[in-house]
Amino acid sequence: MTTEAVKTRRKASLATPTGLGADAVRDISGALTILLADMFALYLKTKNFHWHVSGPHFRDYHLLLDEQGDQIFAATDPIAERVRKIGGTTLRSIGQINRQQRVLDNDAEYVTPLDMLAELRDDNLQLIAHMREVHDLCDEHGDVASASLLENWIDEAERRTWFLYEATRRTGG
């Protein structure tokens, strides 16, 4: 395919039938695409920590992080499909994820298990705040379906945060 053909295809309108206006499609699909980048970044960080956790609570943390990683990954396809369903375009590459993600990577050679859990807890809290902002945007544009999906993802992220908090909480005093 020629460069000119690629440029022409990029300019082609989707014209997906939806009850949302052009501004709503632009705003919501843009916000959901950034959320999707965050979800992929959080998924990989969660799996990174799942693979590299060690210590006396290895089994519990390893299984917890595996479960949480699966849950995060399970949300990625519905997010991307929602963007497409309303007439937008979404992520196309790892490079695009890297440019848009707000969740910070952790490439450290060693991270203590409690630091792993605390970092993921904070990342999930950040994700919840971003999802609430996107929910408000959906409400402003009357996109009930996207708002409804976000409510479920917020609930899942709150549960992940709760588990991570409880796993790092010190007992006593």
Which residue stretches match the model-derived regions?
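Acidic, low-complexity proline/glycine-rich segments
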Residues: 1-18
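Conserved alpha-helical segments that form or flank metal/cofactor-binding pockets of metalloenzymes
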Residues: 53, 57-96
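Amphipathic alpha-helical coiled-coil segments
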Residues: 75-80, 160-168
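Amphipathic alpha-helix face/heptad-repeat signature
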Residues: 28-38, 42, 68, 116, ...
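Disorder-to-helix initiation segments
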Residues: 13-35, 113
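Helix-loop segments that flank and shape redox-cofactor active sites
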Residues: 20-27, 42-67, 133-145
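Acidic/histidine-rich alpha-helical segments that form the ligand environment
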Residues: 81, 95-152
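Long, contiguous binding/interaction regions
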Residues: 2-3, 58, 70, 94-98, ...
